[in-house]
A protein has these predicted regions:
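Protein kinase catalytic-loop region centered on the HRD/HxD motif
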Residues: 115-125
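AlphaC helix of the eukaryotic protein kinase fold
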Residues: 38-60
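Activation-segment/catalytic-loop signature of the eukaryotic protein kinase fold
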Residues: 72
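Flexible N-lobe loop architecture of eukaryotic-like protein kinase catalytic domains
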Residues: 13, 53, 62-65, 168
Length: 311
């Protein structure tokens, strides 16, 4: 099948928002990925504006850890996005295939993703939808950030609107809490998403479980309970858990100021995080079970003493 100068090889991905195909340029035989908008959203101007922004964003970012457009471009007769073809797998699939990755492997992947995010931030852009499905790991082990449909470009808000009337562009479990409160995103918002991904790679779960998706108000986010990465993962150093805890803090001002600080703390023991948090912080349920058991023992002893005194 031919399409606007490309030979369609096969479908790579399909969703209710777009279809992605592997295609070959008829002139150069270069393999590329073609992303075509869903016909169901052809009357959605906000979606179409975000879609048109994707390749524009890709052409302005130069990083080995960000999806690239092809070097050549031709006049087009239809609306679609052309990018390099990455032969590999999503980070989601990678985590399924590698359920217990070595700490060093996780560090290397997180550092690559951070480099890609810094390329966005240097251009005053926020990715806003960082999640395992939007990260590809190629056959050489290189991590690449993909899908720029939710990217915010400073000064071009009208072309890529942020969340409107509670319509969060990112995926709930990885979306920073400030977005749910109607606040503007910052680089620390992308930091939150990266922290959640790092936590998930090491533990196989999410730091707040399903709580993020349920919370909406400032007070609800203030009550979020971080589940320590040390639970059931004794091989993870306490200072790694401390770094993760700070990266995914519900309050953006209590997160790291920069991505480089986070990646540094994943490699170097921070004295502030050298000891495990108190049991009540790591496992509140277990703490109260112990506390209840101790209290019950105290009550039994007091009753026994009282009984002996009376007799």
């Amino acid at each position: 099948m031919l399409f606007d100068g490309y030979r369609i090889v096969r479908e790579l991905h399909a969703s209710n928002r777009s279809h992605i195909y592997l295609a070959a340029d008829i002139e150069t035989d270069e393999l590329v990925a073609l992303k075509i908008p869903s016909i169901d959203l052809r009357d959605d101007p906000a979606y179409l504006k975000r879609f048109m922004m994707e390749e524009w964003v890709a052409r302005r970012i130069d990083s080995p850890n960000v999806l690239k457009p092809p070097s050549l471009s031709r006049r087009r007769n239809y609306l679609y996005v052309v990018t390099e073809f990455i032969e590999g797998q999503t980070l989601t699939q990678w985590m399924i295939d590698n359920p217990k990755p070595h700490l060093e492997t996780v560090r290397a992947i997180v550092e690559q993703i951070a480099r890609g995010l810094r390329a966005f931030h240097r251009k005053e852009m926020l990715h806003q939808d960082l999640r395992p499905d939007n990260i590809m790991i190629d056959r050489t082990g290189t991590a690449k950030i993909i899908d720029f449909g939710s990217t915010l470009v400073t000064g071009v808000v009208e072309a890529a609107p942020l969340a409107v009337h509670g319509d969060i562009l990112g995926t709930l479990q990885y979306t920073a809490p400030e977005y749910f409160q109607g606040e503007s995103g910052t680089p620390r918002s992308d930091m939150f998403s990266l922290g959640v991904i790092a936590y998930q790679m090491l533990t196989g779960r999410l730091p707040y479980g399903s709580q993020i998706a349920k919370a909406r108000t400032r007070s609800q986010f203030g009550r979020l309970k971080y589940r320590s990465a040390l639970e059931g993962k004794q091989e993870i150093p306490a200072w790694i858990d401390g770094a993760l805890r700070r990266a995914v803090h519900p309050d953006p001002y209590k997160r790291y100021e920069s991505l480089s600080e986070f990646t540094f703390d994943l490699r170097h023991a921070n004295a502030n995080y050298s000891s495990a948090p108190a049991l009540i912080e790591r496992n509140p349920l277990l703490f109260w079970k112990f506390a209840t058991a101790i209290l019950a023992c105290v009550v039994v002893v007091l009753l026994a003493v009282l009984h002996s005194v009376r007799h």
